[in-house]
Amino acid sequence: MTTNRAFEIRSGYSHTLGANYDGEGVNFAIFSAHAERVELCLYDPSGEHEIARLELPEYTDEIWHGYVPKLQPGALYGYRVYGPYDPENGHRFNPNKLLIDPYARELVGDIQWNDAHFAYQLLHDDKDLTFDDQDSAPFTPKCRVIDPAEANWEDRQRPSIPWSNAIIYETHVKGFTQLNSAIPEPIRGTFEGMGHKASVDYIKSLGITSVELLPVHWFPDDQHLLDKGLKNFWGYNSLGFFAPATRYYGPKGIQGFRDMVRAFHDAGIEVILDVVYNHTAEGNELGPTLSFKGIDNFSYYRTMPDQHRYYINDTGTGNTVNTSHPRVLQMVMDSLRYWAESMYVDGFRFDLGTILGREPEGFDQRGGFFDAVTQDPVLAKLKLIGEPWDIGPGGYQVGGFPPGWGEWNDKYRDTVREYWKGDNVTNDFAARLLGSGDLYDLRGRRPWSSVNFITAHDGFTLNDLVSYNDKHNEANGEDNNDGHNDNRSCNYGAEGPTDDEGINAIREQQKRNFLTTLLFSHGTPMLLAGDEFGRSQMGNNNGYCQDSEISWVHWDNLPETANALREFTRHLIQLRATQPLLRRESWRDGLEIRWFNAGGGAQQSEQWDEGSTIGVCISRPDLQPEAGIWHDALLLFNPFEGSVPFRIPMWGEGGWVLELTTADNAQQGMRITEEMDFDLAGRSIVLFRRP
């Protein structure tokens, strides 16, 4: 038993990691397989003054632990960890650095970047092989003990939207709310603003079922961005896997996040979090020591097998989290369960998800992480979405995730963009339209496994996709060298905004084509926030550092074309939601598909290799007769500039009624009762149904 001033520390227990309040005191437990001792540092409410330093008295199963009686929620703390400073063997212990608890449920303060954050002498020629003795505590956030009783979800139920009914809306807490005048100014840019009635009602009015939020785990602003007057806007640089990003706090603090989830659930909308477990904000061997690196670098990160000083960089960020280590895997699983059970979210999208399936020999869809999730009684019921790639060997794994997972399908994105540019991808386009069975009709996976998208946070918005040939990222301060160059975009005659009515008309029609393709494709559609009314980032396709009006959604003074596009999008979503044949549930659900060419005959094998107009008849004869439910639909696609006479076949009985067109010149409600040539406008889609 060790005492320090007014504090006493007892043995405590090792089975629950983090700082856990039991009503009488707080148990502290932290994993480190290679540390020699660990000190718990307690701070006054300001976080500026250390009031006690207590050595954790016990070491059990590689867990350092101790119990502080009478300590209450709200207490601030950090760790100092002692051990070898031996970078060449993968160890970077430095007790001069105050470290953030990997299990901290809340952090107080921001990182005030200082040379003291680095475990080595920055100006020394030997760099990270040197040792720095400056104290980083004055410049480092403090961890806060929370009261678990505040997370009360009794008598609450999740919306539990079936995958086949889901429509995902990707957005950003601050970006979505900062400029919305319908939200009270004090809570704009916060969780409370995201959960405000104005936000929830708008998303509900579109017909969205599931909101996917860009990262909300705690993350810092990188020094190099601050030096340029920029910030880490997207948040893909996590450090606290259990702690919400305090930059999104409103007056209610952490409770604002829970209230946001409740508000969406009350509206029948799911909340999905974009999570970043593949790397941390500590960078490579020359990065700062903030948490994992100083606690047990060799365990938490994957190092080069023959040079442990250096990190495997399959993420492109400098380090890679070592989820093949059982304790690191446990941390990720504990984090997921915390957000699922204590914060009550409904699913996760895993950034660079291939990393999580990497074992020492490479990616394995039966690897430890996937097995752990599959058998977990809580997580296996949630929506799990992988970004199925990283930059390491064999990192591209689209179609390679295990059953139960959805995947961002970039083949869908690229093919659809190419098709509407007029490229020769008809065969691939057909496969993407019908759920990418070539990728997902395996091991009992369903069409919903393909998360289809045209745009996402990373890349052009929909408006910019049809307005710019090239990226314009000058505001990022990297001489326009950042961001993707291969955008498969087209400006149709002018770069950026123009007064040319003809060009603007084409752009609006192409937006309708993209949205119609997305929402009538089998699979799970994901819409980028603001695309429904033509939000622009002025050609910036990499807004990761733009916490500014470049990335924020603009709500006021929208042109009539924006309002018209929004209403068109609502109509598309309503059609998808009400018509089962537009949202396939299974590869074996009785759906009948007939592809035909502009002459009305069956699409021939040689025609699949040509860029061409195409038609498809989708039938569900297995559906029970019900008023308003379609059993048959015709979709016609023309990606080319000129109109095409398209022979409408008369399969079945009753003829056809024109339900929807993306062109301005076709007649809504037009009825066809006999085989005839229909003038399919250039760059358009037409949907027919039975009367």
Regions picked out by a protein language model, each given a short descriptive name:
Residues 32-34, 58-60, 70-72, 83, ...:
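Short, flexible loop/turn elements at secondary-structure junctions
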Residues 106-181, 187, 415-502, 597-608:
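Glycine-rich phosphate/pyrophosphate-binding loop
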Residues 30, 79, 171, 203, ...:
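Conserved, mostly hydrophobic/aromatic
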Residues 167-169, 211, 271-273, 348, ...:
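Hydrophobic faces of well-ordered beta-strands that scaffold small-molecule active sites
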Residues 86-90, 177-179, 219-223, 279-282, ...:
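Short catalytic/ligand-binding loop motif for oxyanion handling, primarily in non-cytosolic enzymes
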Residues 1-169, 174, 503-508, 512, ...:
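Carbohydrate-interacting/catalytic domains
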Residues 136, 172-345, 352-378, 420-421, ...:
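Substrate-binding/active-site clefts of carbohydrate-active enzymes
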Residues 344, 359, 365-529, 533-534, ...:
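Conserved alpha/beta catalytic core and glycan-binding cleft of carbohydrate-active enzymes
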